[in-house]
Amino acid sequence: VVGGDECNINEHRSLVAIFNSTGFFCSGILLNQEWVLTASHCDSTNFQMK
């Protein structure tokens, strides 16, 4: 993000952090109760969704 501003922790409740066994992996946006939209570079078979 270029020129972005910090936000409060509850300001964007649809933001998702994806972690793998080594820590933070990628981020995404919660579309509904089942789906998270991420960038294509977040695709990996090295993690399991819970």
From Swiss-Prot:
The keyword Secreted applies. N-glycosylated. Expressed by the venom gland. The active site is at H41. Residues 1-50 form the Peptidase S1 domain. Optimum pH is 6.0-10.5. Transmembrane segments: none annotated. Optimum temperature is 4-60 degrees Celsius. It comes from the Eukaryota. Its EC number is 3.4.21.-. GO terms for molecular function: serine-type endopeptidase activity; toxin activity. Belongs to the peptidase S1 family. Snake venom subfamily. Snake venom serine protease that interferes with the hemostatic system of the prey. It preferentially degrades the Bbeta chain (FGB) of fibrinogen, with minor effects on the Aalpha chain (FGA). It presents a lower ability to degrade fibrin clots than BpirSP41. It shows a decrease in the clotting time of human plasma in the presence of increasing doses of the enzyme. Monomer. This is Thrombin-like enzyme BpirSP27. The lineage of its organism: Eukaryota, Metazoa, Chordata, Craniata, Vertebrata.
